Amino acid sequence: MKVCKFGGTSVGTVERMKHVAELISESTPKIVVLSATAGTTNHLEEIAASLFNRDIEQAHEKITRLEFQFIDFANELLTDESTKREAIDYILDRFQRLLDNLSMIEYTSV
């Protein structure tokens, strides 16, 4: 079995994601491992640093920026409207949960 691993810059733009999709679309069985998109890990580290410094507003801004980035990817990559809506709803739900937890941190740190 073939294992294909793609790092963050390999999936960092819509064009690169499409290229990876072409590479893995062949019918032979394989395991595909994808890293977070380029910059995502850095964003998460910045969010964690903001939370550590109790800068909830800055953390909220960074989370929202990351959310919009993922929504942009979904809008550009997905052509089927139903699939696109489902993906965006999933992204919105996950980020809303994150923001809800952020509100709890803010509430308990006062």
Task: For every predicted segment, state its role.
Residues M1-V110:
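Nucleotide/pyrophosphate-binding catalytic subdomain
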